């Protein structure tokens, strides 16, 4: 996972990590993790932090070493990338930029992609993704359906 990071990213993470490794023993406490991540432009919730800590702190000693931290950051960066890609994809479908994908917009994009769909197929795709039943797909619904793939 961490091997997907650039040298530049690694040194940026090392710098941030070192700032919070007060005693220089190569470990930061789980409490400090949130502060480090926020300094790197991530904005994890308390619940996310707890999940990350449980995931990373393999020996359960309450501290995170730099290799563990790198793996964690690599994973977060990957998640952030795919979130950006999803937003971009949603914008492509949402032709009028009103925050919703209508049946007409879905049909238009699918046709441009070479997918000739019947009205029934388009309606079925909308129904599948349309959690709140308003006949169109909002961003949350779009993310849910895309992440399920």
Swiss-Prot record:
Keywords: Calcium, Cell membrane, Cytoplasm, Membrane, Metal-binding, Repeat. It holds the Pfam family EF-hand_7. The keyword Cell membrane applies. It comes from the Eukaryota. The keyword Repeat applies. Residues 8-43, 44-79, 81-116, 117-149 form the EF-hand domain. Ca(2+) 4 binds at residues 130, 132, 134, 136, 141. CDD domains: EFh. One of its GO terms (cellular component) is plasma membrane. Ca(2+) 2 binds at residues 57, 59, 61, 63, 68. Ca(2+) 1 binds at residues 21, 23, 25, 27, 32. Its main location: cytoplasm. Ca(2+) 3 binds at residues 94, 96, 98, 105. GO terms for molecular function: calcium ion binding. Interacts with ZAR1 (via CaMBD domain). Binds to IQD1. Binds to MEE62 in a calcium-dependent manner. PANTHER family: CALMODULIN, MYOSIN LIGHT CHAIN 1, 3. This protein has four functional calcium-binding sites. Calmodulin mediates the control of a large number of enzymes, ion channels and other proteins by Ca(2+). Among the enzymes to be stimulated by the calmodulin-Ca(2+) complex are a number of protein kinases and phosphatases. Belongs to the calmodulin family. This is Calmodulin-1. It comes from Arabidopsis thaliana (Mouse-ear cress). The gene is CAM1.
